[in-house]
Amino acid sequence: AFPAAKQVFEAGSDILGFDLLKACAEYSAEELARTEISQPAIMATSLAAYEAAKTLGITADMVAGHSLGEYAAMTAAGMLTLENAFRVIRERARAMGECAKAQNGAMCAVMGLSAGEIADVCEKAEGFVIPVNFNSPVQTVIAGEADAVDRAAGVFAGMGKRTAKLTVSAAFHSKFMQPAADDFK
C-alpha cells in the first residue's frame, strides 16, 4: 500500500546486510533488543511511517527527535540521505552494541515523581544508577548497573510509583556508553 515505506526497509536492508522487515516482523523480543538490530529497525520504522504519511498528503513543517530519533528527523528534513542515515546508524549501533556486551546495564522508566525526587533515590541506591532521560515532568528514565536499577525500581514501587523496565541491552545515555562515544567520533 505504501511503496515509499517499503523502499525505506529495502534501502536499510541493502546497507545493513540483513532483512529489516523480516527482523521487525519475525525476530524474537530478545533478538530485537540487541542494539545492532533495534536501532536500524526503529530508524526504518520511523522513516517508513514518515514516508507513508507523505504519501497520504501529510507533511511536516518541522521535525524533531531524541537520541536515535534525531537521525530519523535529520533524514526526514533532508540533512542526511536515507543511505547515509543507515550507514551512520549501523556504526552507532555497532559501537553501542560493543559497549552493551561489556557491561550489565539496564534502564527503567519511572512515573509520577519529579526528576529531583528520582535523583535522590538514585543517589541513595547501592551501585551506579542515575536519571538519564527527562521525558516529561512526570516521567524520567534511569540507567545504570542492572542490580542498582532494579533496587531503585523497588524503592519507587514501595513509594507506590509505577515503573517500567525498558527492553534494552545496556545503560544507554550513561557513562557506560563513553567508549561508544569515543569510538563513534
Where are these regions (language model features)?
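Gly/Ala-rich beta-loop-alpha elbow adjacent to hydrolase catalytic centers
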Residues: 46, 61-65, 69, 73, ...
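An amphipathic alpha-helix/helix-turn recognition signal
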Residues: 7, 41, 67-68, 80, ...
